[in-house]
Design a protein with these regions (language model features):
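Non-transmembrane alpha-helical segments in soluble domains
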Residues: 9, 75, 79, 87, ...
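Mid-domain alpha/beta scaffold segments of enzyme catalytic cores
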Residues: 22, 29-153, 157-161, 165, ...
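Mid-to-C-terminal alpha-helical segments outside catalytic/metal-binding sites
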Residues: 2-19, 31-38, 47-48, 54-85, ...
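Catalytic pocket-lining loop regions of alpha/beta-barrel enzymes
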Residues: 103-110, 120, 140-141, 155-271
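Short catalytic/ligand-binding loop motif for oxyanion handling, primarily in non-cytosolic enzymes
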Residues: 44-45, 95-98, 150-152, 181-184, ...
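Active-site-proximal loop/turn and secondary-structure-junction residues that shape catalytic pockets
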Residues: 42, 92, 118, 146, ...
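Sec/Tat-exported extracytoplasmic proteins
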Residues: 82, 106, 137, 143-146, ...
Length: 334
């Protein structure tokens, strides 16, 4: 599947809608058992999103315009699919505040994470800022860590103080791994990004320097399945999430990758993560594609959707309020 980065992140397009399989998951058919989404994204409330927001798989246009609209639409999707906990990534500065805004909007549902990069144009935030946030309880997760976009691996010494901080506060670390949209390295935002730093094995140095870490290899390290398996085999403090491949890949390709991981014995280490980015409806597509995996038992689906993340992220059981409003529905900007 070839989608240029600018088109992928901004406009999507009906030209790739044929990649989606027919039969959307309507709200009435959505799973009613609770789900944890460990891979969500927040944007500043006043940020103007590139319009129109068009889902790159379905071609459906969204009416959202700002980061505030995006938050409202994502929370609606979470209620619709009974996602009772969501780990949301915000970047430095305003985007870090965006993660806090999500939490303030629905504190029982949202877990705030700090996205860090370490490139020249997106430097690492002051360590004291994160220390204070972890100490206050505002932050619970370090991630998404996008060292790959900085042309580095998480094992680079510049990240050591941040990983030590995560160890100190027993905070999970979520690391971007795998590949990136076509053309990423030619985008002014990401000239330092390199595919070579997406290999799961690049995490190994950090795991040995910081053995108390709990690490989520995001996107399941796709397409490097053997390396993802090797890391989980050797390090029992490593889990993976499904990430954007759960809805951006054609369903058969995603299922083949997921089946490989489960058949290899890692069904207790895979966590659901939608990685919806600009597209709130990507959340539902991701849920649908896991639900449609007929090779999974119901127990395995519950592990992926809830149990594995609840254990790894040490999340409390779903609050009754979160379950009671699971079927509500309102317009995305309502």
């Amino acid at each position: 599947m070839h989608i240029a980065r600018r088109d992928f992140l901004k406009y999507g397009g009906g030209t790739v809608a044929a990649l989606a399989l027919p039969g959307g998951l309507a709200a009435a058919d959505a799973p009613r058992k609770p789900i944890i989404d460990v891979h969500m994204h927040a944007y500043p409330a006043t940020m103007k999103l590139p319009v129109p927001i068009v889902n790159p798989i379905t071609g459906v246009k969204s009416s959202i315009v700002t980061g505030a609209d995006h938050l409202t639409a994502c929370l609606e999707q979470m209620r619709r699919y009974n996602i009772v906990k969501g780990v949301v990534s915000g970047g430095d500065g305003d985007r870090l505040q965006a993660a806090y805004d999500w939490h303030d909007r629905d504190p029982e549902r949202i877990v705030a994470g700090a996205g860090i990069r370490g490139s020249e144009d997106t430097p690492l935030p002051p360590l004291d800022t994160l220390r204070s946030a972890f100490a206050s309880g505002k932050l619970k997760v370090l991630g998404e860590v996008t060292a790959q976009y900085a042309g580095l691996s998480i094992s680079d010494p510049k990240y050591d103080p941040y990983l030590a901080l995560a160890e100190e506060f027993d905070a999970p670390v979520a690391i971007h791994l795998g590949t990136m949209p076509a053309g990423t390295t030619f985008d002014p935002c990401c000239r330092t990004a390199r595919a070579a730093f997406g290999h799961p094995e690049t995490v190994e140095g950090a795991l040995n320097k910081h053995p108390k870490l709990r690490v989520n290899l995001m996107h399941s390290g796709w397409p490097y399945v053997e390396e993802a398996e090797a890391m989980m085999m050797l390090y029992d403090n490593v889990n993976i999430d499904t990430g954007a491949l759960s809805w951006l890949l054609p369903r058969p390709a995603f299922h083949d990758y997921l089946r490989r991981l489960v058949d290899a014995g890692f069904g207790k280490r895979v966590m659901f993560g939608s990685d919806h980015m600009y597209w709130p409806d990507g959340i539902g597509l991701a849920v649908e594609h896991v639900e449609a995996a007929t090779f999974l038992t119901e127990e395995q689906k519950r592990d992926i959707f809830y149990n594995n993340a609840a254990a790894f992220y040490k999340l409390a059981p779903a609050a009754p309020k979160a379950l009671s409003d699971a079927g509500t529905s309102r317009p995305p900007n309502g």
